[in-house]
Amino acid sequence: ETFRIRPSSFFQTNTAQAENMAHMVLRGLFDDFDNHIAAGSISERRPFTVVDAYCGVGTFALLLSRHATKVIAIEESASAIKDARWNLRETENVEILKGKVEDVLPSLTTRLDGLVIDPPRAGCQKSVLDTLIQHPVSRVVYVSCDPSTLARDLDILCHQHPAYRLHSVQPLDMFPHTAHIECVAILEHIEQ
């Protein structure tokens, strides 16, 4: 894939690991993702509405658009939105919403099948976590660049207010020879 990225927009610089991360995200949302690809039905979209929160330049939204009937991308950076619009210009099933995730997500939660959330290093705002607890999503894929804020947010979602079960957490060495890692956590809603 080729993406347009302005200097003020964020993009993973380790593209090999970014590709691994993308596959983890897709596998996390779609249980049958590997079988779907093996069967050659990669172009078949599932009746699935998914949100790409903190979508940046639209990397995950583009990949998700190939597998879900509807993708809603949320981003607050004007620069990133310009890049996302260009990167997603050939998709017909992606809607880009400008705003802060904590402001936009509450109006979407009643119609979501999946959520990809890739917040900044500070993690999710409390209001985002509150929304996920009050209006659970079937499957959440949480991509984090800070294991400590990921642990804090998972504690809230899975223990303090147990709306979700942690299915898995996979670290990725995005920056070899440094202490920085990314993690991909898969959460499943606990039916009450």
Language model region names:
Residues 1-192:
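Rossmann-like S-adenosyl-L-methionine
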